[in-house]
Amino acid sequence: MKLAYVWILAALMAPSVFAAMPPVSESVNAQGSSPIFGVTIPAGYRQWKLIAPSHQTGSFNELRAIVGNPLAMTAYRKGTLPFPDGAILIKLAWKRVPSNEFKGAFVPGAATTVQITVKDSKKYSSTGGWGFGRFINRKPEDEAQHKTCFGCHEANVKNHDFVFTRFAP
């Protein structure tokens, strides 16, 4: 009999519990948005499709994987430029370290950053339609760091909708 009361109570409370939970599409980093742009880390981004890998040399010495939300992936596959509003690109970066198992190969070491670009041509009209977020350990970098984002994109990839990454089919 007590078990029946537990089930009834659970059934009555379920709508309240689920209503208080954030929807799946809501950011998992609501308390930590990037300065200037207000970009947050989207929920579920680690399940997004790979756009391309990359390797940054020099002082960065990083291996990177760039992923995109479904809207970004469709734009890449169709060759659509400019990217549509709502496209999100995320660069995951790790220190490049030599493989212990295979001489001459390199593997991801410690995670360095998660960098996010969000296309919203109205909200981010002063930065080519893109908002930027750079996170270390899920915490946004400071404002000074974010002030450098668009300048680099504008100087180097203005003719590719300010996006460095090319699709690796």
Put a short name on every predicted segment.
Residues 1-4:
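Positively charged n-region of N-terminal signal peptides that target proteins for export
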Residues 22-29, 34-64, 80-169:
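Sequence context surrounding c-type heme c attachment/ligation sites in exported
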Residues 64-74:
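Short, structured beta-strand/loop micro-motifs enriched in basic residues and often containing a Trp
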